[in-house]
Amino acid sequence: AGLGSSNLYIWSYEISYYQYLYPYNNYHILLDNFKYFKEFGGNYIYPEGTWENMNNPGFAKLRDYINSKGMFDVNSDYNELVDKFFKYYFREAAPVMRKYFNEVQVNLTINENITGGRVHSYGLSDNRVWPEALVTGWLNSFDVAQNEILKYKDTDSELYEALSKHILIESLFPRYVLCTKYDKSFSASQIKEMRKSFLKDFEDLGN
């Protein structure tokens, strides 16, 4: 059943606009949304995500990829798209980055009673959702990921730079949490350097 229109224009919201650098756990429902919109006469959709930042963390690029496929085929398989994205976007670093992504998803799922599902909510940044030990542990994942792609540094510098950039983008989120939520765990000089490094990477990535 439809709404009697075959030319429905839709503007959807896809991230937490109060917590812009945090992952928003809607990856798995994007395709379902497209199916729903199509059923009710959707003809055009503008999925508003991180449009202000070129390279936002929280797997925004995965969301963009799923959207790009779902707009042309609402019956695309979510798991296949995720597998393909990680395979080609991270290459040899895919296993460790997929593990990190899965852990983020699980963590958000078990804490939905705290975060809620609204795009305008401060609950997503609640310290109970992101314990310091968990966030700190994730930083090692990016070091491992960078080591996995080192072989391209001398054989294919262009590919190496692209893959290294992809990993760096995702490292922004846990670094941001440590810089803003757990600054008291570091000395004044340490947190100053951490924030300086974060800001440089954030801006160098075109954000």
Segments (PLM) and residue ranges:
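Structured mid-domain segments that build the active-site/substrate or prosthetic-cofactor binding neighborhood
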Residues: 1-95, 99, 106
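Catalytic domains of carbohydrate-active enzymes that cleave complex glycans
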Residues: 40-42, 67-207
